[in-house]
Amino acid sequence: MAQEDDLRALGKIMDFLRAVSIILAIMNVYWYCYEAMRMWGVTIGVVDRILINFNRTGGLFHSILYTKLFSLLLLTLSCLGTKGVKAEKMSWNRIWTVLAVGFCLFFLNWWILLLPISHFGNATLYIFTMTAGYICLLMGGLWMSRLLKHNLMEDVFNNENESFMQETKLMENEYSVNLPTRFYYKKKWQRGWINVVNPFRATIVLGTPGSGKSFAVVNNYIKQQIEKGYSMYIYDFKFSDLSTIAYNHMMNHQNGYKVKPQFYVINFDDPRRSHRCNPIHPDFMSDISDAYESAYTIMLNLNKTWVQKQGDFFVESPIILFAAIIWYLRIYKNGKYCTFPHAIELLNRRYEDVFPILTSYPELENYLSPFMDAWQGGAMEQLAGQIASAKIPLSRMISPQLYWVMSASEFTLDINNPEEPKILCVGNNPDRQNIYGAALGLYNSRIVKLINKKGQLKSSVIIDELPTIYFKGLDNLIATARSNKVAVCLGFQDFSQLVRDYGDKEAKVVINTVGNIFSGQVVGETAKTLSERFGKVLQKRQSISINRQDVSTSINTQMDSLIPPSKISGLTQGMFVGSVSDNFTERIEQKIFHAEIVVDTDKVKREESHYQPIPIINDFKDADVNDCMKQAILDNYNQIKEDVKLIVKDELERIAGDESLKHLIQK
């Protein structure tokens, strides 16, 4: 009740001020249009004397503007105290337009009184313009009172609520990767840092093609880790993008290493720029389980659908058969012919020759028993199916160039050996990714076993476009490599790729055990998963209720997504969201980030302008400086075939001459 009385009293005061304002405007017209007023017979003697006294004592009419200014002042005060019915569509543009028109008509009409026309004409025009101007000023003032003071549509994308303070301090150590950033907070762009102080807790880099994950993140990982003396294994899907960076950066930053690192390349497309390496070298296979692991890796890389069918009869059979062949080559003549090409060639010999040879060795007899039972039992269709499921996928890998690279060893795969640190780049080709990816998967599995040991150098495993190869043991490497100083960085487009190619269970293990994550633009389930990972934060919500008499504003808080899926789906190139992990001794209060990773493009261009191509390793020149690459590769291919023919011939002769074994040969 008291509030209503106060409002009524305020309304009366505002009406009084507006009335005085109108009287002042009328006084202005009466004084400056006096001749017209006298002609119309509306002059009043008492009013004349009052106005003359005002002018004599206060100089009210010394200028035509004085009464107008006082009138405008009182009009303004009356409008400020008026509570109008709020209108959502009312805008400042509309108000300023009306006020500008009113100001011009009200104040800039003095020249009308000087026009060489009759007093009647002058007064009529002056009164009309002044009245119209006053009405416009009154409308503008009243509209201002109806304007909503809080425009809830200023921030339609909720940028202010979803911006947050991020890490601004550089935290660097001997292992860290540090990326400068720009982030938006409190209507300003701030400078900050993404501090990956513990890269050994593994890193995932996500993003659709063109989101900048290689340029902004992966390239920086390679450069900074080389500067800090990491040995390195790089899977370069689009060879030689990453390899060229690694080679040139290593050549320019060798002072980070106690022992000068060696640079090695495996490239099936260009043997001139490729070293040779046997991934099943006998020195690194001490047990038949190592042979099984190699067979398992190669088969699942050739048949990605088998990943989710592990344990099935027609999945295990070819793996067992190929594992037996690899282990046979390991024990035959102390591993002299233990190479991947020799294993493929031996598999493609007649099974009537291969089975007796393999079963003549006691350690392989049980491995081959299912095949021997089918053969001796006459189940030829079953046997043919088992053998074909091994031969058909592996036959895709019969290539002279691939045989050349994989049939000899110019270096070993223990890249983090303190005495011989290495930077190894293996190159794939998008046009041949299924074939090359299978062979490179073999290198992956072997390297994982060799580097994940104590007492070695700190090392980095960088896999670009992870789904293009099956990386056996990846989940175990992430889970256990931290104590052995192995930093893993995985780049791919989204989680659905990983689920498709690695299976739901293994993909979930990889996703949930990684400590550092960067994500450019991703959509769908991946964006939802990331949003849930980043959690919720307390956000302010404001609502306005409008009625005829008043506007009520309510402000409340609620928990909402810190970075919603819609934000992640709409990230521009170079913008990343993610989180990092910290250490006991290096605490990071704000682990989550939503920022643009700042890359000095001018510096990058200067560096790239001085890059040298990866050098030729083998020029394949004969004594007369003729190019003999094709012939050398073909000779190697034919030599492997001859080696296998000789092995089969010698072994069958041995079995035939041994009374205890000759029963294995079926006539």
Which residues fall in each region the model found?
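N-terminal charged/capping segments associated with class I S-adenosyl-L-methionine
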Residues: 592-595
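P-loop NTPase motor domains
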Residues: 25, 42, 149-153, 194-486, ...
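Low-complexity, polar-biased intrinsically disordered regions enriched in Pro/Ser/Thr/Gly
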Residues: 183-189, 303-313, 541-558
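N-terminal short leaders/motifs
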Residues: 169-189, 368-381, 516, 522-523
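Conserved ATP-driven motor cores of ASCE-family P-loop NTPases powering translocation/secretion/packaging/pilus
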Residues: 478-480, 484-487, 491-581
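Hydrophobic alpha-helical segments involved in membrane association or supramolecular assembly
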Residues: 75-78, 82-83, 441, 445, ...
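Basic- and hydrophobic-enriched, low-structure N-terminal and domain-boundary segments
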Residues: 1-211, 215, 220, 546-548, ...
